[in-house]
Protein backbone atom coordinates (compact mmCIF):
# COMPACT_ATOMS: atom_id res chain seq x y z
CA UNK A 1 0.00 0.00 0.00
CA UNK A 2 1.27 3.45 -0.93
CA UNK A 3 -0.10 6.49 0.85
CA UNK A 4 -0.43 9.39 -1.59
CA UNK A 5 0.47 12.66 0.07
CA UNK A 6 -0.56 15.25 -2.53
CA UNK A 7 2.40 17.38 -3.58
CA UNK A 8 4.91 15.00 -1.99
CA UNK A 9 5.11 12.01 -4.32
CA UNK A 10 8.57 10.48 -4.71
CA UNK A 11 10.23 8.83 -7.69
CA UNK A 12 10.50 5.46 -5.88
CA UNK A 13 6.76 5.60 -5.18
CA UNK A 14 6.03 6.38 -8.80
CA UNK A 15 8.26 3.56 -10.05
CA UNK A 16 6.46 1.14 -7.73
CA UNK A 17 3.05 2.34 -8.92
CA UNK A 18 4.12 1.70 -12.52
CA UNK A 19 5.95 -1.59 -12.00
CA UNK A 20 4.21 -3.30 -9.07
CA UNK A 21 0.61 -4.15 -8.17
CA UNK A 22 0.55 -1.81 -5.19
CA UNK A 23 -2.67 -0.27 -3.94
CA UNK A 24 -3.24 3.37 -3.05
CA UNK A 25 -4.76 5.36 -0.25
CA UNK A 26 -5.02 9.12 0.14
CA UNK A 27 -3.27 10.79 3.05
CA UNK A 28 -6.05 11.83 5.47
CA UNK A 29 -4.14 15.07 6.08
CA UNK A 30 -5.30 16.20 2.63
CA UNK A 31 -9.02 15.84 3.35
CA UNK A 32 -9.52 19.30 4.83
CA UNK A 33 -8.01 21.04 1.80
CA UNK A 34 -10.02 18.92 -0.61
CA UNK A 35 -13.26 19.66 1.25
CA UNK A 36 -12.46 23.38 1.42
CA UNK A 37 -11.89 23.52 -2.33
CA UNK A 38 -15.14 21.70 -3.07
CA UNK A 39 -17.06 24.04 -0.76
CA UNK A 40 -15.55 27.10 -2.42
CA UNK A 41 -16.77 25.94 -5.84
CA UNK A 42 -20.23 25.11 -4.48
CA UNK A 43 -20.48 28.60 -2.95
CA UNK A 44 -19.44 30.27 -6.22
CA UNK A 45 -21.93 28.19 -8.20
CA UNK A 46 -24.72 29.05 -5.76
CA UNK A 47 -24.08 32.78 -6.16
CA UNK A 48 -24.40 32.51 -9.92
CA UNK A 49 -21.68 35.03 -10.68
CA UNK A 50 -19.75 34.15 -13.86
CA UNK A 51 -16.62 32.10 -13.12
CA UNK A 52 -14.72 30.30 -15.87
CA UNK A 53 -15.02 26.55 -15.73
CA UNK A 54 -17.74 26.64 -13.11
CA UNK A 55 -20.68 28.23 -14.90
CA UNK A 56 -19.28 29.11 -18.33
CA UNK A 57 -18.40 27.31 -21.51
CA UNK A 58 -14.86 26.25 -22.31
CA UNK A 59 -12.07 27.31 -24.62
CA UNK A 60 -13.38 29.78 -27.20
CA UNK A 61 -16.85 29.41 -25.59
CA UNK A 62 -15.64 30.76 -22.25
CA UNK A 63 -17.84 33.85 -22.50
CA UNK A 64 -21.04 31.77 -22.65
CA UNK A 65 -22.84 31.79 -19.29
CA UNK A 66 -24.44 28.51 -18.20
CA UNK A 67 -27.60 28.58 -16.01
CA UNK A 68 -27.37 26.92 -12.60
CA UNK A 69 -29.80 24.16 -13.54
CA UNK A 70 -27.51 23.07 -16.40
CA UNK A 71 -24.22 22.86 -14.49
CA UNK A 72 -24.38 19.08 -14.05
CA UNK A 73 -25.20 18.64 -17.74
CA UNK A 74 -22.32 20.97 -18.60
CA UNK A 75 -19.83 18.72 -16.81
CA UNK A 76 -21.27 15.53 -18.31
CA UNK A 77 -21.21 16.99 -21.81
CA UNK A 78 -17.65 18.19 -21.29
CA UNK A 79 -16.42 14.69 -20.46
CA UNK A 80 -18.32 12.95 -23.24
CA UNK A 81 -17.46 15.46 -25.97
CA UNK A 82 -13.78 15.44 -25.08
CA UNK A 83 -13.43 11.62 -25.11
CA UNK A 84 -12.15 11.57 -28.69
CA UNK A 85 -8.90 9.59 -28.38
CA UNK A 86 -7.73 7.19 -31.07
CA UNK A 87 -5.10 4.50 -31.34
CA UNK A 88 -4.03 1.61 -29.16
CA UNK A 89 -4.87 1.53 -25.44
CA UNK A 90 -2.35 3.20 -23.18
CA UNK A 91 -0.13 0.72 -21.34
CA UNK A 92 -1.40 -0.50 -17.99
CA UNK A 93 1.62 0.92 -16.18
CA UNK A 94 1.04 4.36 -17.69
CA UNK A 95 -2.67 4.33 -16.81
CA UNK A 96 -1.81 3.48 -13.20
CA UNK A 97 0.59 6.40 -13.09
CA UNK A 98 -1.94 8.71 -14.74
CA UNK A 99 -4.57 7.91 -12.11
CA UNK A 100 -2.13 8.38 -9.24
CA UNK A 101 -0.91 11.71 -10.62
CA UNK A 102 -4.47 12.94 -11.09
CA UNK A 103 -5.31 12.00 -7.50
CA UNK A 104 -2.26 13.86 -6.24
CA UNK A 105 -3.12 16.99 -8.21
CA UNK A 106 -6.76 16.98 -7.13
CA UNK A 107 -5.73 16.21 -3.57
CA UNK A 108 -3.97 19.52 -3.13
CA UNK A 109 -7.36 21.19 -2.83
CA UNK A 110 -7.16 23.76 -5.63
CA UNK A 111 -9.44 22.00 -8.12
CA UNK A 112 -12.74 22.13 -6.25
CA UNK A 113 -13.62 18.45 -6.53
CA UNK A 114 -15.46 16.37 -3.95
CA UNK A 115 -13.77 13.54 -2.10
CA UNK A 116 -16.50 11.23 -3.38
CA UNK A 117 -15.10 11.54 -6.90
CA UNK A 118 -11.55 10.92 -5.75
CA UNK A 119 -12.64 7.93 -3.67
CA UNK A 120 -14.20 6.42 -6.79
CA UNK A 121 -10.91 6.74 -8.68
CA UNK A 122 -9.02 5.09 -5.82
CA UNK A 123 -11.58 2.28 -5.63
CA UNK A 124 -11.24 1.58 -9.34
CA UNK A 125 -7.44 1.63 -9.08
CA UNK A 126 -7.36 -0.76 -6.13
CA UNK A 127 -9.83 -3.14 -7.78
CA UNK A 128 -7.56 -3.25 -10.85
CA UNK A 129 -10.32 -1.76 -12.97
CA UNK A 130 -8.38 0.57 -15.23
CA UNK A 131 -9.88 2.87 -17.86
CA UNK A 132 -9.15 2.04 -21.47
CA UNK A 133 -7.44 5.21 -22.66
CA UNK A 134 -6.53 5.58 -26.35
CA UNK A 135 -2.94 6.75 -26.47
CA UNK A 136 -3.34 9.34 -29.24
CA UNK A 137 -5.28 12.60 -29.27
CA UNK A 138 -3.57 15.11 -26.98
CA UNK A 139 -1.42 18.10 -27.96
CA UNK A 140 -0.33 18.72 -24.36
CA UNK A 141 -2.35 21.93 -23.86
CA UNK A 142 -5.01 22.68 -22.59
CA UNK A 143 -3.80 19.73 -20.63
CA UNK A 144 -4.26 16.15 -21.81
CA UNK A 145 -7.96 16.59 -22.46
CA UNK A 146 -8.81 13.52 -24.55
CA UNK A 147 -6.91 10.91 -22.50
CA UNK A 148 -8.24 12.29 -19.23
CA UNK A 149 -11.76 12.42 -20.67
CA UNK A 150 -11.59 8.68 -21.33
CA UNK A 151 -10.50 8.15 -17.72
CA UNK A 152 -13.31 10.36 -16.46
CA UNK A 153 -16.00 8.84 -18.67
CA UNK A 154 -15.63 5.57 -16.78
CA UNK A 155 -16.85 7.34 -13.63
CA UNK A 156 -20.04 8.13 -15.55
CA UNK A 157 -20.43 4.52 -16.69
CA UNK A 158 -19.36 5.32 -20.24
CA UNK A 159 -16.53 3.81 -22.26
CA UNK A 160 -14.39 0.76 -21.62
CA UNK A 161 -12.07 -0.58 -18.95
CA UNK A 162 -9.67 -3.42 -18.32
CA UNK A 163 -10.84 -5.56 -15.39
CA UNK A 164 -7.71 -7.31 -14.19
CA UNK A 165 -6.45 -7.16 -17.76
CA UNK A 166 -9.67 -8.23 -19.48
CA UNK A 167 -11.44 -5.69 -21.68
CA UNK A 168 -14.98 -4.84 -20.55
CA UNK A 169 -17.57 -2.07 -20.48
CA UNK A 170 -17.27 0.80 -18.02
CA UNK A 171 -20.56 -0.24 -16.38
CA UNK A 172 -19.20 -3.74 -15.78
CA UNK A 173 -16.06 -2.21 -14.34
CA UNK A 174 -18.02 -0.03 -11.93
CA UNK A 175 -20.05 -3.06 -10.85
CA UNK A 176 -16.93 -5.13 -10.17
CA UNK A 177 -15.50 -2.26 -8.11
CA UNK A 178 -18.77 -1.87 -6.19
CA UNK A 179 -19.51 1.57 -7.61
CA UNK A 180 -22.41 3.29 -9.33
CA UNK A 181 -22.11 5.95 -12.05
CA UNK A 182 -21.40 9.40 -10.63
CA UNK A 183 -23.14 12.68 -11.32
CA UNK A 184 -20.44 15.32 -11.56
CA UNK A 185 -21.02 18.67 -9.88
CA UNK A 186 -19.85 22.14 -10.91
CA UNK A 187 -16.26 22.19 -12.24
CA UNK A 188 -15.62 18.52 -11.45
CA UNK A 189 -15.51 17.41 -15.08
CA UNK A 190 -13.09 20.19 -15.93
CA UNK A 191 -10.95 19.37 -12.90
CA UNK A 192 -10.70 15.76 -14.05
CA UNK A 193 -9.90 16.66 -17.67
CA UNK A 194 -7.54 19.58 -17.25
CA UNK A 195 -3.96 18.69 -16.41
CA UNK A 196 -0.72 17.20 -17.69
CA UNK A 197 -1.17 13.79 -16.10
CA UNK A 198 -1.25 11.74 -19.33
CA UNK A 199 1.94 13.20 -20.79
CA UNK A 200 3.68 13.10 -17.41
CA UNK A 201 2.63 9.49 -16.79
CA UNK A 202 3.86 8.41 -20.22
CA UNK A 203 7.14 10.26 -19.72
CA UNK A 204 7.71 8.77 -16.27
CA UNK A 205 6.81 5.25 -17.36
CA UNK A 206 9.21 5.39 -20.29
CA UNK A 207 11.86 7.15 -18.21
CA UNK A 208 11.91 4.19 -15.82
CA UNK A 209 12.45 1.87 -18.79
CA UNK A 210 15.24 4.08 -20.13
CA UNK A 211 16.90 4.14 -16.70
CA UNK A 212 16.98 0.34 -16.81
CA UNK A 213 18.43 0.46 -20.31
CA UNK A 214 21.11 2.90 -19.18
CA UNK A 215 22.26 0.49 -16.49
CA UNK A 216 22.16 -2.39 -18.96
CA UNK A 217 24.26 -0.35 -21.39
CA UNK A 218 26.92 0.17 -18.72
CA UNK A 219 27.16 -3.60 -18.36
CA UNK A 220 27.11 -4.27 -22.11
CA UNK A 221 29.69 -1.58 -22.75
CA UNK A 222 32.02 -2.96 -20.10
CA UNK A 223 31.68 -6.47 -21.51
CA UNK A 224 32.50 -5.11 -24.96
CA UNK A 225 35.69 -3.56 -23.57
CA UNK A 226 36.84 -7.02 -22.54
CA UNK A 227 35.61 -8.62 -25.77
CA UNK A 228 37.64 -6.10 -27.78
CA UNK A 229 40.63 -6.32 -25.43
CA UNK A 230 40.19 -2.65 -24.69
CA UNK A 231 42.01 -0.59 -22.10
CA UNK A 232 40.63 0.44 -18.71
CA UNK A 233 42.98 3.43 -18.50
CA UNK A 234 40.42 5.83 -20.06
CA UNK A 235 38.22 5.18 -17.02
CA UNK A 236 40.84 6.50 -14.56
CA UNK A 237 39.07 8.78 -12.08
CA UNK A 238 41.65 11.54 -12.49
CA UNK A 239 40.70 12.08 -16.13
CA UNK A 240 37.04 12.63 -15.33
CA UNK A 241 37.56 14.73 -12.23
CA UNK A 242 39.51 17.21 -14.34
CA UNK A 243 36.46 17.73 -16.54
CA UNK A 244 34.02 17.85 -13.65
CA UNK A 245 30.72 16.64 -15.10
CA UNK A 246 28.92 14.60 -12.46
CA UNK A 247 27.44 12.10 -14.91
CA UNK A 248 30.80 11.44 -16.55
CA UNK A 249 32.48 10.91 -13.18
CA UNK A 250 29.76 8.47 -12.10
CA UNK A 251 29.80 6.57 -15.40
CA UNK A 252 33.58 6.14 -15.29
CA UNK A 253 33.32 4.79 -11.75
CA UNK A 254 30.81 2.19 -12.95
CA UNK A 255 33.13 1.00 -15.73
CA UNK A 256 36.06 0.76 -13.32
CA UNK A 257 34.06 -1.35 -10.90
CA UNK A 258 32.61 -3.60 -13.59
CA UNK A 259 36.01 -4.32 -15.15
CA UNK A 260 38.06 -4.60 -11.97
CA UNK A 261 40.08 -7.81 -11.79
CA UNK A 262 39.48 -8.88 -15.38
CA UNK A 263 41.99 -11.56 -16.48
CA UNK A 264 41.37 -10.52 -20.09
CA UNK A 265 42.47 -7.02 -19.25
CA UNK A 266 45.52 -8.27 -17.37
CA UNK A 267 46.52 -10.39 -20.37
CA UNK A 268 47.12 -7.42 -22.67
CA UNK A 269 48.36 -4.73 -20.27
CA UNK A 270 51.76 -4.63 -21.96
CA UNK A 271 50.54 -4.64 -25.58
CA UNK A 272 51.60 -1.90 -28.02
CA UNK A 273 48.07 -0.57 -28.64
CA UNK A 274 47.99 3.13 -27.70
CA UNK A 275 44.33 4.17 -27.87
CA UNK A 276 40.97 2.46 -28.38
CA UNK A 277 38.26 3.75 -30.73
CA UNK A 278 35.90 6.32 -29.25
CA UNK A 279 33.02 3.86 -28.79
CA UNK A 280 35.12 2.18 -26.09
CA UNK A 281 37.35 4.99 -24.86
CA UNK A 282 34.73 7.74 -24.65
CA UNK A 283 32.00 5.73 -22.98
CA UNK A 284 32.12 7.79 -19.76
CA UNK A 285 31.87 11.04 -21.70
CA UNK A 286 28.88 9.92 -23.80
CA UNK A 287 27.07 7.91 -21.15
CA UNK A 288 27.82 10.60 -18.59
CA UNK A 289 26.17 13.22 -20.77
CA UNK A 290 23.16 10.92 -21.15
CA UNK A 291 23.07 10.45 -17.39
CA UNK A 292 23.09 14.20 -16.74
CA UNK A 293 20.17 14.67 -19.14
CA UNK A 294 18.24 11.82 -17.56
CA UNK A 295 18.74 13.16 -14.07
CA UNK A 296 17.53 16.59 -15.15
CA UNK A 297 14.48 15.04 -16.80
CA UNK A 298 13.72 13.12 -13.61
CA UNK A 299 13.86 16.34 -11.59
CA UNK A 300 11.48 18.09 -13.99
CA UNK A 301 9.04 15.20 -14.12
CA UNK A 302 8.99 14.85 -10.34
CA UNK A 303 8.05 18.52 -10.00
CA UNK A 304 5.30 18.03 -12.58
CA UNK A 305 4.08 14.86 -10.87
CA UNK A 306 3.45 16.91 -7.75
CA UNK A 307 2.02 19.93 -9.54
CA UNK A 308 -1.49 21.32 -9.76
CA UNK A 309 -1.95 21.65 -13.51
CA UNK A 310 -5.68 22.39 -13.49
CA UNK A 311 -7.33 25.57 -14.75
CA UNK A 312 -8.90 27.59 -13.30
CA UNK A 313 -7.43 27.22 -9.84
CA UNK A 314 -9.46 27.60 -6.67
CA UNK A 315 -8.03 29.42 -3.64
CA UNK A 316 -10.43 28.58 -0.80
CA UNK A 317 -8.80 30.97 1.70
CA UNK A 318 -9.79 34.00 -0.37
CA UNK A 319 -12.56 32.53 -2.49
CA UNK A 320 -10.70 33.53 -5.64
CA UNK A 321 -10.80 31.68 -8.94
CA UNK A 322 -7.68 32.35 -10.99
CA UNK A 323 -7.28 31.41 -14.64
CA UNK A 324 -3.76 30.63 -15.81
CA UNK A 325 -1.87 28.14 -17.92
CA UNK A 326 -0.49 25.42 -15.66
CA UNK A 327 -1.99 22.90 -18.09
CA UNK A 328 0.65 23.79 -20.70
CA UNK A 329 3.00 20.82 -20.68
CA UNK A 330 6.09 22.49 -22.14
CA UNK A 331 8.30 21.33 -19.22
CA UNK A 332 7.17 17.75 -19.80
CA UNK A 333 7.76 18.05 -23.55
CA UNK A 334 11.31 19.32 -23.02
CA UNK A 335 12.04 16.58 -20.47
CA UNK A 336 10.70 13.88 -22.79
CA UNK A 337 12.65 15.25 -25.75
CA UNK A 338 15.84 15.19 -23.68
CA UNK A 339 15.11 11.61 -22.63
CA UNK A 340 14.69 10.74 -26.31
CA UNK A 341 18.13 12.15 -27.09
CA UNK A 342 19.69 10.18 -24.23
CA UNK A 343 17.97 6.91 -25.12
CA UNK A 344 18.86 7.26 -28.79
CA UNK A 345 22.52 7.97 -27.94
CA UNK A 346 22.68 4.95 -25.63
CA UNK A 347 21.58 2.82 -28.57
CA UNK A 348 23.80 4.63 -31.07
CA UNK A 349 26.92 4.05 -28.97
CA UNK A 350 26.02 0.39 -28.48
CA UNK A 351 25.60 -0.04 -32.24
CA UNK A 352 29.10 1.36 -32.77
CA UNK A 353 30.53 -1.13 -30.29
CA UNK A 354 28.84 -3.99 -32.16
CA UNK A 355 30.39 -2.70 -35.39
CA UNK A 356 33.79 -2.62 -33.70
CA UNK A 357 33.49 -6.18 -32.39
CA UNK A 358 32.61 -7.72 -35.76
CA UNK A 359 35.46 -5.85 -37.51
CA UNK A 360 38.50 -8.10 -37.26
CA UNK A 361 40.89 -5.20 -37.90
CA UNK A 362 39.60 -3.24 -34.93
CA UNK A 363 38.80 -6.02 -32.46
CA UNK A 364 41.42 -8.65 -33.25
CA UNK A 365 38.61 -11.21 -33.22
CA UNK A 366 37.53 -13.47 -36.11
CA UNK A 367 35.52 -11.59 -38.75
CA UNK A 368 31.87 -11.31 -37.70
CA UNK A 369 32.72 -13.24 -34.53
CA UNK A 370 32.63 -16.69 -36.12
CA UNK A 371 35.63 -18.95 -36.68
CA UNK A 372 34.66 -20.55 -39.96
CA UNK A 373 33.86 -17.34 -41.83
CA UNK A 374 32.61 -17.49 -45.39
CA UNK A 375 30.38 -20.49 -45.06
CA UNK A 376 29.17 -18.84 -41.85
CA UNK A 377 28.12 -15.17 -41.73
CA UNK A 378 28.04 -14.95 -37.95
CA UNK A 379 26.95 -11.59 -36.55
CA UNK A 380 27.06 -9.79 -39.92
CA UNK A 381 23.32 -9.17 -40.27
CA UNK A 382 22.62 -8.95 -36.56
CA UNK A 383 24.68 -5.79 -36.74
CA UNK A 384 22.60 -4.60 -39.69
CA UNK A 385 19.50 -4.93 -37.51
CA UNK A 386 21.20 -2.88 -34.80
CA UNK A 387 22.12 -0.24 -37.39
CA UNK A 388 18.53 -0.11 -38.65
CA UNK A 389 17.20 0.40 -35.13
CA UNK A 390 19.81 3.03 -34.28
CA UNK A 391 18.98 4.93 -37.45
CA UNK A 392 15.25 4.76 -36.72
CA UNK A 393 15.92 6.20 -33.27
CA UNK A 394 17.62 9.22 -34.82
CA UNK A 395 14.36 10.16 -36.52
CA UNK A 396 12.26 9.36 -33.46
CA UNK A 397 14.53 11.57 -31.34
CA UNK A 398 13.59 14.67 -33.35
CA UNK A 399 12.13 17.05 -30.74
CA UNK A 400 8.34 17.07 -30.63
CA UNK A 401 8.35 20.27 -28.60
CA UNK A 402 9.50 22.40 -31.53
CA UNK A 403 6.17 21.78 -33.22
CA UNK A 404 2.89 23.53 -32.44
CA UNK A 405 -0.51 23.77 -34.09
CA UNK A 406 -3.22 26.18 -32.92
CA UNK A 407 -6.48 24.63 -31.71
CA UNK A 408 -9.87 25.70 -30.38
CA UNK A 409 -10.38 28.45 -32.97
CA UNK A 410 -6.95 29.94 -32.12
CA UNK A 411 -7.83 30.42 -28.45
CA UNK A 412 -5.26 27.73 -27.70
CA UNK A 413 -2.73 29.01 -30.19
CA UNK A 414 0.46 27.42 -28.86
CA UNK A 415 0.68 23.85 -27.62
CA UNK A 416 3.48 21.65 -26.29
CA UNK A 417 3.05 18.30 -28.08
CA UNK A 418 4.25 16.77 -24.80
CA UNK A 419 2.10 13.69 -25.11
CA UNK A 420 3.68 12.70 -28.41
CA UNK A 421 7.13 13.54 -27.04
CA UNK A 422 6.48 11.18 -24.13
CA UNK A 423 4.71 8.51 -26.18
CA UNK A 424 7.45 8.02 -28.76
CA UNK A 425 9.92 7.28 -25.99
CA UNK A 426 8.43 3.79 -25.86
CA UNK A 427 9.50 3.08 -29.45
CA UNK A 428 12.98 4.48 -28.86
CA UNK A 429 13.34 2.39 -25.71
CA UNK A 430 12.20 -0.77 -27.49
CA UNK A 431 14.70 -0.21 -30.30
CA UNK A 432 17.50 0.44 -27.82
CA UNK A 433 16.56 -2.67 -25.86
CA UNK A 434 17.10 -4.80 -28.95
CA UNK A 435 20.35 -3.05 -29.87
CA UNK A 436 21.66 -3.82 -26.38
CA UNK A 437 20.53 -7.43 -26.69
CA UNK A 438 22.57 -7.78 -29.88
CA UNK A 439 25.57 -6.13 -28.22
CA UNK A 440 25.36 -8.45 -25.22
CA UNK A 441 25.36 -11.46 -27.55
CA UNK A 442 28.26 -10.08 -29.58
CA UNK A 443 30.27 -9.16 -26.49
CA UNK A 444 29.68 -12.57 -24.92
CA UNK A 445 30.85 -14.18 -28.16
CA UNK A 446 33.96 -12.02 -28.13
CA UNK A 447 34.73 -12.89 -24.51
CA UNK A 448 34.37 -16.59 -25.33
CA UNK A 449 36.87 -16.13 -28.14
CA UNK A 450 39.40 -14.67 -25.66
CA UNK A 451 39.68 -18.04 -23.89
CA UNK A 452 41.49 -19.20 -21.86
CA UNK A 453 41.24 -15.73 -20.38
CA UNK A 454 37.87 -14.68 -18.99
CA UNK A 455 36.11 -11.53 -17.92
CA UNK A 456 35.92 -9.81 -14.53
CA UNK A 457 34.18 -11.20 -11.44
CA UNK A 458 31.49 -8.52 -11.76
CA UNK A 459 30.77 -9.44 -15.38
CA UNK A 460 30.96 -13.21 -14.93
CA UNK A 461 27.25 -13.39 -13.97
CA UNK A 462 26.43 -11.59 -17.23
CA UNK A 463 28.16 -14.32 -19.19
CA UNK A 464 26.42 -17.00 -17.14
CA UNK A 465 23.00 -15.43 -17.71
CA UNK A 466 23.54 -15.13 -21.46
CA UNK A 467 24.93 -18.64 -21.83
CA UNK A 468 22.06 -20.09 -19.79
CA UNK A 469 19.77 -18.98 -22.63
CA UNK A 470 21.93 -18.84 -25.76
CA UNK A 471 24.85 -21.12 -26.60
CA UNK A 472 28.16 -19.93 -28.02
CA UNK A 473 27.77 -19.17 -31.75
CA UNK A 474 29.55 -22.02 -33.57
CA UNK A 475 27.60 -22.31 -36.82
CA UNK A 476 25.00 -20.21 -38.59
CA UNK A 477 21.49 -20.92 -37.36
CA UNK A 478 18.10 -19.25 -37.01
CA UNK A 479 19.33 -16.17 -35.11
CA UNK A 480 16.17 -14.18 -34.33
CA UNK A 481 15.15 -16.23 -31.26
CA UNK A 482 18.57 -15.61 -29.68
CA UNK A 483 18.04 -11.86 -29.92
CA UNK A 484 14.47 -12.14 -28.67
CA UNK A 485 15.35 -14.11 -25.55
CA UNK A 486 18.16 -11.74 -24.54
CA UNK A 487 15.95 -8.73 -25.29
CA UNK A 488 13.38 -10.21 -22.93
CA UNK A 489 16.03 -10.50 -20.23
CA UNK A 490 17.01 -6.88 -20.84
CA UNK A 491 13.37 -5.87 -20.37
CA UNK A 492 13.24 -7.87 -17.15
CA UNK A 493 16.25 -5.95 -15.78
CA UNK A 494 18.38 -9.08 -15.60
CA UNK A 495 21.50 -7.13 -16.61
CA UNK A 496 20.55 -3.74 -15.18
CA UNK A 497 20.67 -5.26 -11.70
CA UNK A 498 24.36 -6.04 -12.17
CA UNK A 499 25.36 -2.42 -12.80
CA UNK A 500 27.00 -0.81 -9.74
CA UNK A 501 24.77 2.22 -10.07
CA UNK A 502 21.18 3.19 -9.31
CA UNK A 503 18.85 6.07 -10.08
CA UNK A 504 16.87 8.15 -7.61
CA UNK A 505 13.73 6.21 -8.58
CA UNK A 506 15.35 2.99 -7.31
CA UNK A 507 16.41 4.24 -3.90
Curated annotation (Swiss-Prot):
Presence of the UniProt keyword Metal-binding in the record: no
Superkingdom assignment: Bacteria
Cross-link entry 5-imidazolinone (Ala-Gly), positions: 141-143
Segment forming the signal sequence: none
Modified residues (2,3-didehydroalanine (Ser)): 142
Alphabetical UniProt keywords: Cytoplasm, Histidine metabolism, Lyase
A single BP term in Gene Ontology: L-histidine catabolic process to glutamate and formate
Top enzyme class: lyase
Metabolic or biological pathway: Amino-acid degradation; L-histidine degradation into L-glutamate; N-formimidoyl-L-glutamate from L-histidine: step 1/3
A single MF term (Gene Ontology): histidine ammonia-lyase activity
CDD domains: PAL-HAL
Catalytic activity: L-histidine = trans-urocanate + NH4(+)
Pfam annotation, one family: Lyase_aromatic
InterPro entries with a match to the protein in the record: Aromatic_Lyase, Fumarase/histidase_N, HutH, L-Aspartase-like, Phe/His_NH3-lyase_AS
GO cellular component labels: cytoplasm
PTM (free text): Contains an active site 4-methylidene-imidazol-5-one (MIO), which is formed autocatalytically by cyclization and dehydration of residues Ala-Ser-Gly.
Iron-sulfur is among the record's keywords: no
NCBIfam families recorded: hutH, PRK09367.1
Entry similarity comment: Belongs to the PAL/histidase family.
Protein's name in the database: Histidine ammonia-lyase
Organism: Burkholderia vietnamiensis (strain G4 / LMG 22486)
Amino acid sequence: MITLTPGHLTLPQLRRIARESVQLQLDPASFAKIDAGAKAVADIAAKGEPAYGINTGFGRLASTHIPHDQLELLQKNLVLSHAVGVGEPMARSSVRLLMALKLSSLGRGHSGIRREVMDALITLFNADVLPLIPVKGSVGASGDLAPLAHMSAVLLGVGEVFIRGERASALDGLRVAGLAPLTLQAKEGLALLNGTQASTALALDNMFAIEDLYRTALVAGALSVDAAAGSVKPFDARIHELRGHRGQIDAAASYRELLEGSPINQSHRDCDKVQDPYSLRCQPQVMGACLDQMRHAADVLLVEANAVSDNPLIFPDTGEVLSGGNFHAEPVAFAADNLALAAAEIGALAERRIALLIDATLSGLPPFLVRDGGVNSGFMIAHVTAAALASENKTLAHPASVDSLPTSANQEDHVSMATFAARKLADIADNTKHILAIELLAAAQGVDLRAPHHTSPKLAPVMETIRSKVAHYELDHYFAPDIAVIAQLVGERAFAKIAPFSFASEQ
